[in-house]
Amino acid sequence: MKIVFWGTPKYAAENLKTIAKAGYEVIAVVTQPDRKRGRGKKLSPSPVKEAAEELSIPVYATNSISKDQKTKEILLNLKADVYLVVAFGQILPKEILDQPKLGCWNSHASLLPVWRGAAPIQWSIINADAKTGICIMSMEEGLDTGPVIEQESTVIKDSDNLEILTNRLSVMSSKLLLKSLEKIKLTKGLNKSSRLKQLNAIEQRNLNGIPSYARQITKEDNLIDWNQDARKILKKIQGLYPNAYTLYNGKRIKILDAIISCDNNQSKESQDIKNQSKSNRIPGEIFMINKQIGIKIMTNDFPVLIKYAQLEGKKATDSYTLSIQSNLSINDKLGI
């Protein structure tokens, strides 16, 4: 079974490695072009391209597969049996979807139809969802609307940030793709309708969940608004890790790890602390700097305790060291 793998980030690269090491014949990889990355803005290949080169698999990079006639023709001539798509970053046109004999399949990191779109992992954390997962679906022209042949869920832990959850989902995705490929290869000779029937594909309208859209994350999304509730701020910090930031004297401070100092499931004493804090403090105000504990900042309800952070131009550090680097003081206000 000849496979063309489509993907771009590290998440997808791990899937590619798993499939190749399982003995499947990956005849080509399609990915996004090299981009400028990191502090030095050095031109670097995508993680999927790096993985493909390590595996000696031919790589084709394209800015827009819809407009890239040359790559389309190359792929057509490869006569692949299956296209596997994992976080590629572009919508595939119908002429591409129709090329492989055994179909075009996507591993999507959500419990469809919830969080269709480009950033499902981020939004599942930001939205404080109880769980998320992986769906393997047959691709069609709609955005992540195809019938699902495999699904697996995982609980989103309170301690999960984007990196931790992404790594866990990548492992789940790799396993589900292998399971799916074993079934897909048995559908040789069937048309699409018969193939989906044999694979017990389920239309998304028959799955649990209300359709929602996980739009691409923008630079503006990363800015923390201290006027929001503490839990909402915490979920943004976790869901956008390591990019959520605040401002102090015009400089960016990335907040890498934080906890809510008091939550609304605690005792009446905690509620009294909340009420006292709200009456005496304003959102964004620093009201504790402690070497052992960290920095406490007021929000719309409960204080947030910053544990690790990174000042613009500096390395990540504990928040007390950050307070020295940034010359932070009690009663200073973040977000300006």
UniProtKB/Swiss-Prot annotation:
PANTHER family: METHIONYL-TRNA FORMYLTRANSFERASE, METHIONYL-TRNA FORMYLTRANSFERASE, MITOCHONDRIAL. (6S)-5,6,7,8-tetrahydrofolate binds at residues 110-113. Gene3D superfamilies: 3.40.50.12230. It comes from Prochlorococcus marinus (strain NATL2A). It is an enzyme of class 2 (transferase). The keyword Transport does not apply. Keywords: Protein biosynthesis, Transferase. Belongs to the Fmt family. The keyword Protein biosynthesis applies. It catalyses: L-methionyl-tRNA(fMet) + (6R)-10-formyltetrahydrofolate = N-formyl-L-methionyl-tRNA(fMet) + (6S)-5,6,7,8-tetrahydrofolate + H(+). One of its GO terms (cellular component) is cytosol. The lineage of its organism: Bacteria, Bacillati, Cyanobacteriota, Cyanophyceae, Synechococcales. Its EC number is 2.1.2.9. It comes from the Bacteria. It holds the Pfam family Formyl_trans_N. This is Methionyl-tRNA formyltransferase. HAMAP family: Formyl_trans (MF_00182).
